[in-house]
């Protein structure tokens, strides 16, 4: 009993090398226009990697450093931890050095560095730069060993003590806030949200559907989880404009609300290939020769922090298996449901899947087989349940030819045998 709904993680397929001659439609750029333009283009590079990172590099950005410094807090949150640690240490060390220099200059101008002078010092026991640096550390960290202290001899020294205390509080608040914000980022939550290696196209409820599977490895829920998908493909407009990366939304039930999912067990997300789908005119052969990328997105709020997280992956055309379904992963036990993640990425072939496009199927150009074959998913689920019941009842497998009680051996041939469906192994 597989999951009832239809929507990360995949093996990165090898990219084709070299250049190829592609035929692009001028009308809409998806192979169903009348006018054809032959152009030589390079095989598509993955826009979104399988781990969710975008394969994009920014170049020639004007005033990049100034723009990043203007938003220093976000910059500190986004940088790596090693640089965050460097900024953390430098912020304190530089502030201690700055105020240490200030107190050393105050002592120098007041003549406190002259040990022969008997007048009252601005800061007692500060007669060198090292002593001034230690006094700066003691002031900002409120250590207060008791040997060095400011006096009322110099108002400027009193002001600098107050000013350093305020600056120290600001640095503490900024650094601690940035560290906490970085720790609370739900970025690592994506590691426990997985997409299937491949997407599949198969019949569901009499219609061709594009499907992919998503799962949550944690027991903590993803609140308000919902899915989105986009098809990325280059095309040429009717005016001759070349769009290298055209983004087309793929409907996964936004209008009906089924894009919002309850992600407790793995769920199969379904896109019905109808007349509004960008895959409506594509057959199996077209998919095999196509050059596009489907980006899938899962969004939701982390239950522990209530922060929004986004998990991404993508499927190239050669990662879409036509005529396959996912093996079931959800099984009903006696008092609970069991999820077997060893089957999460596995698929099996459905022989009766039409090879034509959804348009041809809707226009009755392809006759569906009426053969009522027992579904492999149900067979796996029922077999698992029967084996569990047999193990609980302690019924051993009998190899004896003894007949059951109450049945005559001469009339045994008239007793109908229990129909057992033939098991077909999964072809992955």
Curated annotation (Swiss-Prot):
Q: Specify whether Oxidoreductase is a keyword of the entry.
A: no
Q: Which reaction does it catalyse?
A: K(+)(in) = K(+)(out)
Would you name any one GO CC term?
A: intercalated disc
Q: Which keywords appear in this protein's UniProt record, sorted alphabetically? A: Cell membrane, Ion channel, Ion transport, Membrane, Potassium, Potassium transport, S-nitrosylation, Transmembrane, Transmembrane helix, Transport, Voltage-gated channel
Renumbered to this chain, motif PDZ-binding spans 426-428
Modified residues annotated as S-nitrosocysteine in this record? 76
According to UniProt, residues marked as the site described as Role in the control of polyamine-mediated channel gating and in the blocking by intracellular magnesium are: 172
Enumerate the Gene Ontology biological process terms: cardiac muscle cell action potential; cardiac muscle cell action potential involved in contraction; cellular response to mechanical stimulus; magnesium ion transport; positive regulation of potassium ion transmembrane transport; potassium ion import across plasma membrane; potassium ion transport; protein homotetramerization
Q: What intramembrane ranges does the Swiss-Prot or TrEMBL entry report?
A: 129-140, 141-147
Pfam family membership, one: IRK_C
Name a GO molecular-function annotation.
Answer: voltage-gated potassium channel activity involved in cardiac muscle cell action potential repolarization
Q: Where is this region: Disordered?
A: 383-428
* Expression sites by tissue: Prominently expressed in the central nervous system. Also found in other excitable tissues such as heart and skeletal muscle.
The family line of this record is: Belongs to the inward rectifier-type potassium channel (TC 1.A.2.1) family. KCNJ2 subfamily.
What name appears for this protein in its UniProt entry?
Inward rectifier potassium channel 2
The record lists the organism as: Mus musculus (Mouse)
* Record lineage: Eukaryota, Metazoa, Chordata, Craniata, Vertebrata
């Amino acid at each position: 009993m597989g999951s009832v709904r239809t929507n990360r993680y995949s093996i990165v397929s090898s990219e084709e090398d070299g250049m190829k001659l592609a035929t692009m439609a001028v009308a809409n750029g998806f192979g169903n226009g009348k006018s054809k333009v032959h152009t030589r283009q390079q095989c598509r590079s993955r826009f979104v990697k399988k781990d969710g990172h975008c394969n994009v590099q920014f170049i020639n950005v004007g005033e990049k450093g100034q723009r990043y410094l203007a938003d220093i807090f976000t910059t500190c949150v986004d940088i790596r931890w090693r640089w965050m640690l460097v900024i953390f240490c430098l912020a304190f060390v530089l502030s201690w050095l700055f105020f240490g220099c200030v107190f050393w200059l105050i002592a120098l101008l007041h003549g406190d560095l002259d040990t022969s002078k008997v007048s009252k010092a601005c800061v007692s026991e500060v007669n060198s730069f090292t002593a001034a640096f230690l006094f700066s550390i003691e002031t900002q960290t409120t250590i207060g060993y008791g040997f060095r202290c400011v006096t009322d001899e110099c108002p400027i020294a009193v002001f600098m003590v107050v000013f350093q205390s305020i600056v120290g509080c600001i640095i503490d608040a900024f650094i601690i806030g940035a560290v906490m914000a970085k720790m609370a980022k739900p970025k690592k939550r994506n590691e426990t949200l997985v997409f299937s290696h491949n997407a599949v196209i198969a019949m569901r409820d009499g219609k061709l559907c594009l499907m992919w599977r998503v799962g949550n490895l944690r027991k903590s829920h993803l609140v308000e989880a919902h899915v989105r998908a986009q098809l990325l493909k280059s095309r040429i407009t009717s005016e001759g404009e070349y769009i290298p990366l055209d983004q087309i939304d793929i409907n996964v039930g936004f209008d009906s609300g089924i894009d919002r999912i309850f992600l407790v067990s793995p769920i199969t997300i379904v896109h019905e290939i109808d007349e509004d789908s960008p895959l409506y005119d594509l057959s199996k052969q077209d998919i095999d020769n196509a050059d596009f990328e489907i980006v899938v997105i899962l969004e939701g709020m982390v239950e522990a922090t209530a922060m929004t997280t986004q998990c991404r992956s993508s499927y190239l055309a050669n990662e879409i298996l036509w005529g396959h379904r996912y093996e079931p992963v959800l099984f009903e036990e006696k008092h609970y449901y069991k999820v077997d993640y060893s089957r999460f990425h596995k698929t099996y072939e459905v022989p009766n899947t039409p090879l034509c496009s959804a348009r041809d199927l809707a226009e009755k150009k392809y006759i569906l087989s009426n053969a009522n074959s027992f579904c492999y998913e149900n067979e796996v689920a029922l077999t698992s349940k029967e084996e569990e019941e047999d193990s609980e009842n302690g019924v051993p497998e009998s190899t004896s030819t003894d007949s059951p009680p109450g049945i005559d051996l001469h009339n045994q041939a008239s007793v109908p045998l229990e129909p057992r469906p033939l098991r077909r192994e999964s072809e992955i």
